[in-house]
Amino acid sequence: MSIKIGILQADDVLPNLAVQYGEYPAMFQQLLHAANGDTDISLEFVTYAVNAGIYPSEIDEMDAYILTGSKSSVYEDAPWITQLAEFVRALHSRKKKLVGICFGHQMVAHALGGKTSLADVGWGLGVKETSPNNSTDLLGSQPFKLIYSHQDQVVELPEGTVVLASTDICPIAATTLGEHILSFQGHPEFYPDYANDLYEIRRERYPAEIYKAAMASLQTDADQLFVGALMIDFCRR
């Protein structure tokens, strides 16, 4: 079985980090190949730099799409964000498989009638336990850990959206809509070394205690491969 996955790239990795870690599409490819292991599923990837206005000529070029994170906010008045919201609505209307990550999670809500805003609780950083609420069996019942890096949160849901999980500061940390959209506020594509270097570069943005706790949390293993396997299974259904 082959799955063609379009990666909708919504940002560029900081140049000094990209040299070591690659761009976001490479991180997702690494994650999903590792999660796929030695199964009989063949994964094919194509990147579309949506932050530069690049899109597939036809939605059905791909079997599924992943919408990456971004330093931008979905509520910014930028032409590329407006165009991206329109594309998300098109995917939804066609019931095309879409997995949204961080900014992508927020864009799904924003584009389909929900709301994302700056979180009153401030930054969500570091490895955080993510607790399923058992609304479906999609995530199972056991808490899992992901690396987080966000200041915005989804605060209102589009009609029909089901909340799958939450963290200590993020009530809407994972969602699903129908059988074709899945989203996570956390970053399954992030690994500790990259998060460590990213937080260090951005440390002046963070309150000292949040930064300190986030850096310490990176000593805790996260469940990237668990979520990566979920993403593959979701895309193949």
Whereabouts are the PLM-identified features?
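N-terminal beta1-alpha1 cap of cysteine-dependent amidohydrolase-like domains
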Residues: 1-86, 90-94, 211-237
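Hydrophobic/aromatic beta-strand patches that form the interior of the parallel beta-sheet core
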Residues: 6-8, 46-48, 66, 99, ...
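Short glycine-/acidic-enriched loop or helix-start segments at secondary-structure transitions
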Residues: 17, 76-78, 109-111, 158, ...
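Short, glycine/charged-enriched secondary-structure capping and boundary segments
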Residues: 20-23, 60-62, 79-82, 113-116, ...
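Catalytic metal-binding/acid-base residues of hydrolase active sites
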Residues: 49-51, 104, 152, 189
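Cysteine-nucleophile active-site neighborhood
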Residues: 68-135
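Pocket-forming structural segment of enzyme catalytic cores
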Residues: 112-193
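C-terminal and late-domain segments of enzyme folds
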Residues: 170-237
